Amino acid sequence: MNKLMSWVSVLIILPEAFAQTDLRGKVFVFPRESSTDHVTLITKLEKPLKNLTLCLRAYSDLSRGYSLFSYNIHSKDNELLVFKNGIGEYSLYIGKTKVTVRATEKFPSPVHICTSWESSTGIAEFWINGKPLVKRGLKQGYAVGAHPKIVLGQEQDSYGGGFDKNQSFMGEIGDLYMWDSVLSPEEILLVYQGSSSISPTILDWQALKYEIKGYVIVKPMVWG
C-alpha cells in the first residue's frame, strides 16, 4: 500500500515540475555564482533549425564573461550559445563557430538582447535594446541540431552538464522568446517594446516549460 501511495505521489508531482507556466512580469533570479544552479528549458524540437531568432532580457553586475543561453545536442557542445564576454561584448556560437559584436552599454544596467541567424546566407545579427549592431556571418548552409538540452545560468561543456562556475550567470533573466524564423527589424522592435503579437514557435515566456535545479528563484521583474 505504501509503495502504491509513493507511485501516486510521483505521478502527481512530476507533471507539475514541467508545468506550462505564464511568466509574464517575472524573472529567474540566479543569486550566486555556482557550478550547479541552472534552469533547463523544455521544448519539443524535432527538426534541425535553419533559421532562428532569440530574445531575452537580462540584468547582471558581473563584469566577467558568462553564458546567457546554452543549447547543446548529444554529439557536440556550443551548438547554439549566446555568451557575454564582458561589458558590451557579445558572442553567438553556431555549430561551435562564433562571431562577436560590440555595443556601447551603461554598466550595470538591464539589457534587452535579440540575436538571429539565417542558414542560407550565414548572416547573424544582434539587437541590443532595440538597436541593430553590425552584421556578421558564420556557418552558411549549416543546420542547428534538433533534440537539444537548453540551459540558463550555466554554459554546457557536455549534454546537460560540464558546468564551470567562472562561466555561470549571476543576475536575473526574463522575457525569453525563441522563433524558428528570422524576425524583421519591425518585429524585433515590437518584441523590445513588450508586444506579444508575434507568437513564438520554440520557446514562449508566457507558456514556458522548465525545471529548476539548485538555487534559482522566480520573482517579479522590477527593472523591465
From Swiss-Prot:
Gene Ontology cellular-component terms listed: extracellular space
Cofactor note: Binds 2 calcium ions per subunit.
Protein name: Serum amyloid P-component
Domain of life: Eukaryota
Stretch forming the signal peptide: 1-19
Protein's cellular compartments: Secreted
Gene3D superfamilies, sorted: 2.60.120.200
Primary location class: secreted
Positions of the Pentraxin (PTX) domain: 24-224
Alphabetical list of InterPro entries matching this protein: ConA-like_dom_sf (IPR013320), Pentaxin_CS (IPR030476), Pentraxin-related (IPR001759), Pentraxin_domain (IPR051005)
Assembly, per entry: Homopentamer. Pentraxin (or pentaxin) have a discoid arrangement of 5 non-covalently bound subunits.
Source organism (scientific name): Bos taurus
Cystine connections: C55-C114
Residues annotated to bind Ca(2+) 2: E155, D157, Q167
Entry keyword rRNA processing: no
Glycosylation sites: N51, N166
